[in-house]
């Protein structure tokens, strides 16, 4: 008996953060139609790089148009079944900074809400364990931006 191989899918998504005066940065979460909290992501279109797909999907699903790419976070993968198919999905995540504060969920794609949360709040409400690992790494990257002077400090020091 031979095992059927999984169908491969590749997607890309974004972890968006913004600076808040005199407070820790906020991270953007989206809620899907199943009431799961996660991050914007979607399939790569023909000829699109993972970074291009991440910025497109993040902008589409959140309504944020002024996203600044800070760098790749990591690639995660998981297996699932959909309509009788066994799928092995890879998702490339990228870190984005946004100067905009009011996201607008893409309701026609099943996004029911967008919320800015602190790192700890976001870690508490995320619905998927593998998303927590991505967010923790994003938080480390933001702390590094602050440490090297490429980002705004979390608190004023003067």
How would you label these PLM feature ranges?
Residues 20-26, 83-86:
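Short, solvent-exposed loop/turn segments that connect beta-strands within catalytic domains
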Residues 28-31:
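Short, acidic/hydrophobic/Gly-rich beta-strand patch recurrent on exposed beta strands
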Residues 38-41:
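A short gly/proline-enriched turn/hairpin at secondary-structure junctions
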Residues 43-133:
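Unchanged
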Residues 13, 26, 113:
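Conserved beta-strand and immediately adjacent loop positions that scaffold enzyme active sites
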Residues 124-158:
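Charged phosphate-binding loop/patch that engages nucleotide di/tri-phosphates or the phosphate backbone
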């Amino acid at each position: 008996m031979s095992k059927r191989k999984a169908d491969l899918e590749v997607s890309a998504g974004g972890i968006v953060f913004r600076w808040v005066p005199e407070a820790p940065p906020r991270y953007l979460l989206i809620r899907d139609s199943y009431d799961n909290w996660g991050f914007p992501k979607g399939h790569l279109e023909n000829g699109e790089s993972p970074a291009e797909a991440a910025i497109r999907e993040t902008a589409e699903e959140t309504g944020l148009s002024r996203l600044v790419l800070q760098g790749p976070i990591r690639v995660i993968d998981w297996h699932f079944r959909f309509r009788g198919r066994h799928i092995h999905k890879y998702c490339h995540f990228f870190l984005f900074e946004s100067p905009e504060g009011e996201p607008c969920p893409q309701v026609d794609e099943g996004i029911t809400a967008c919320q800015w949360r602190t790192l700890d709040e976001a870690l508490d409400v995320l619905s998927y364990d593998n998303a927590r690992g991505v967010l923790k790494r994003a938080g480390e990257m933001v702390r590094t931006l602050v440490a090297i002077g490429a980002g705004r400090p979390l608190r004023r020091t003067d």
